[in-house]
From Swiss-Prot:
This is Elongation factor Ts. It comes from Aliivibrio fischeri (strain MJ11). Keywords: Cytoplasm, Elongation factor, Protein biosynthesis. InterPro entries: EF-Ts_dimer_sf, Transl_elong_EFTs/EF1B, Transl_elong_EFTs/EF1B_dimer, Transl_elong_Ts_CS, UBA-like_sf. Residues 80-83 are annotated as: Involved in Mg(2+) ion dislocation from EF-Tu. HAMAP family: EF_Ts. GO terms for molecular function: translation elongation factor activity. CDD domains: UBA_EF-Ts (cd14275). It is found in: Cytoplasm.
Amino acid sequence: MATVTAALVKELRERTGAGMMECKKALVEANADIELAIENMRKSGAAKAAKKAGNVAAEGAIIIKEENGVAALLEVNCQTDFVAKDANFTAFAAEVAAAAVASQATVEELQAQFEETRVALVAKIGENINIRRVQYVAGSALASYRHGEKIGVVVAGEGDAETLKHIAMHVAASKPEYVNPSDVPADVVEKEKAVQVEIAMNEGKPQEIAEKMVIGRMKKFTGEVSLTGQAFIMEPKKTVAEILKEKGASVSNFVRLEVGEGIEKAAEMSFADEVAAVQKG
């Protein structure tokens, strides 16, 4: 049997909002499989915030560069928001992004290309800096949007520039995972369906009735995770699909990056802990 470590319990607690003992019990029952534990906790109603997965932790910036029908979205990280606004850091990030869109290099290739520059910048600024990831979007019509330095979106499709720009803004705010409801993978649909059936049965419904109830819930689920199924943020009474149809536009692809997605930030030390650490030192 796999060992349930304190680190696993801590991660599950952060991702679900459930109590420490509840998390430990769920991990024991799931043989230390954290994803299975979350699924089981959702079924039982124990998870209060399972969507909290991927704590936003690292600082830095998202840079977008477009060239010849290709857009590059680049994430460069640092340790503090102060350095993220430093002119040397922003110039470095812009230089890497320009090289990325020109060559469509992988993140590993960019890291190798700029390692010497990065090391020199780390020595100058005094913080660790990392070229974390890069993604590319190609299309005859591209629209990009950055929310501050922290969120970047590029949308590829057909239509006027203003409409596609508004769609990019919607993606930044609403975080869709797929373009259309039909794009949601079958395994994702089946996994969510199993969770919803069990939730309905836990409400005391016979399985046959529970499965019928789930049809509506699954339609809502695929709509919520897909761009065209979501309520348009600027006109909430209409879906994005309806807006696109009205404007004679379409979306074929999009990429959304947010600084620090999936990076867990070390817990900040309290003042009392700092004092204790100083006394020990």
